[in-house]
Amino acid sequence: MREKGSNIKSRLQSRHVSVGPKSAPHRSMYYAMGMTEEQIYQPFIGVATTWNESAPCNITLRRQAQSVKKGVTSADGTPREFTTITVTDGLAMGHQGMKASLASREAIADTIELSVRGHCYDGLVGVAGCDKSLPGVMMSMLRLNIPSVFIYGGSIMPLSLIHI
């Protein structure tokens, strides 16, 4: 598999952190995280989510990212999961927090772009669920101009009157 991976890697960004003598320190970091040689020589696919416990639109994204990672692995890629920030309008309304809402969209795009560029990922799957995180994730994909897939995390579960 290494030879096959090397041929694929010669055209990918991840070659800078996985192929050749100059990348030995990078590979040592991957081995320290439990990655195998086969995983290191496959394309690296970032799996970015806006998972957090601040709002119901983000709460399921961690679980969804695990499914995405299984899909990437089954397609002979190496998933690298990371999260970014999010500010939810539903909780930021009516106080100073609203000043952070629109700015969070830019921060989401910036942090995803920095993570993907900094770690030389070859592709990106973004999973988001709230109003500012959706465009923030998509903006990062446009900036990066790499193979990308956006997944909408889904709607919030219906309100239960018991909790009011």
Residue ranges and their predicted role:
Residues 2-39:
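N-terminal amphipathic/basic leader segments beginning at the initiator methionine
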Residues 6-14, 45-52, 85-99:
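Gly-rich Lys/Arg/Thr-decorated short loops/hinges at beta-loop-alpha junctions or inter-strand turns
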Residues 25-31, 78-126:
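Glycine-rich oxoanion-binding loops at beta->alpha junctions
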Residues 37-41, 46, 52-81:
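Glycine-rich phosphate/diphosphate-binding loop of Rossmann-like nucleotide-binding domains
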Residues 56-57, 106-110, 130-138, 158-160:
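Short glycine/serine/threonine-rich phosphate/pyrophosphate-binding segments
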Residues 63-67, 99, 139-150, 157:
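A glycine- and small-aliphatic-rich helix-loop capping segment at beta-alpha/alpha-beta transitions
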Residues 115-137, 148-152:
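A short, small-residue-rich loop immediately preceding and capping a beta-strand
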Residues 162-164:
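Conserved small/polar residues in nucleotide/adenosyl-binding loops
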